[in-house]
Amino acid sequence: DSRYAMATVIFVNIWRSFPYYTISFLSAMQSIPADLNEAAAVDGAGMFTRFFKITLQQLKSVSLVIVFIHIIWTAINFDFIWVMTEGGPNYATETLPIMIYRYSMKTFDVGAASALSTMMFTAMFIMFLFYYRK
C-alpha cells in the first residue's frame, strides 16, 4: 500500500541508525562533568532545572552533529530503499538517489541523471559547509 510505504522506510531508517545515536548520546552524557550537577544541586536547583539548564545545554553540540549526520545519511540512502521497495508503489518512496539510478540505468537518460547528481552534490556540499562552519 503506497500510504504506508514511506512510513515503513522512515521507520527502518530510524531503526537502523538508532544504535549509533544512542551510543553518541550516552558518551556525551558521560562526558558531562559531575561537578556541574553537584554545584547546581548545592545551589538549590531541582532535578528538572538541572536537566534543562545543564544536561541539555551540554548535549546541544552533539545533537546538532547527530541531526546533520542523519540528514546527510538519509539524503544519500539508496540501498535499503531499493531493496525494500524499488521506489515504492506509485513512486511513493522514490528519493533523489533512486531517481538518479532510474534515469541513468533504467531509461539511460544520462544527462538528466548527471544534472540531478550535480544538484545533489551541491546540496550536500552546502550542508557540509554549514556543518563545518561551527
Predicted features and spans:
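Membrane-interfacial helix termini and adjacent extracytoplasmic/periplasmic loops
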Residues: 1-14, 79-94, 102
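Signature of the 12-TM Major Facilitator Superfamily
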Residues: 7, 25, 52, 64, ...
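Hydrophobic residues within alpha-helical transmembrane segments
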Residues: 11, 56, 64, 68, ...
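Non-cytoplasmic
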Residues: 18-25, 62-87
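A short glycine-centered flexible hinge/capping loop motif at secondary-structure junctions
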Residues: 43-45, 87, 110
